[in-house]
Amino acid sequence: MNTVRVTFLLVFVLAVSLGQADKDENRMEMQEKTEQGKSYLDFAENLLLQKLEELEAKLLEEDSEESRNSRQKRCIGEGVPCDENDPRCCSGLVCLKPTLHGIWYKSYYCCKK
């Protein structure tokens, strides 16, 4: 019975001492991995930031192109009624009261200059 107790005590002491060593080793490994993880996270963050900046630049470029062309897209074409106070006729057209068919409609139309 004493041998069983001594053996059990010896195994218990070895398990505790080796377990503590493993715990310290695990703690050191975890610190190393978190330091490596931080560098990976910084790298990934920088990469993501670059991609987002490129995407933002493309979107702003598309918006500026759209705004340059938007005047011509939103202008009023020839023969379309317009407001004499706020003419939005396309380039080369003027908002005038026509001589013939304007009499019936009492309106201004975009006509060539």
Curated annotation (Swiss-Prot):
Propeptide segment residues: 22-74
Tissue distribution of the protein: Expressed by the venom gland.
InterPro entries linked to this entry: Toxin_22
Domain of life (superkingdom): Eukaryota
Signal sequence, start to end: 1-21
One term of GO molecular function: sodium channel inhibitor activity
Subcellular location: Secreted
Record's GO cellular component terms: extracellular region
Disulfide bond residue pairs: 75-90, 82-95, 89-110
Region (Disordered): 61-83
Keywords: Disulfide bond, Ion channel impairing toxin, Knottin, Secreted, Signal, Toxin
Function: Probable ion channel inhibitor.
Domain notes: The presence of a 'disulfide through disulfide knot' structurally defines this protein as a knottin.
Family listed: Belongs to the neurotoxin 14 (magi-1) family. 01 (HNTX-16) subfamily.
Full protein name: U11-theraphotoxin-Hhn1s
Taxonomic placement: Eukaryota, Metazoa, Ecdysozoa, Arthropoda, Chelicerata
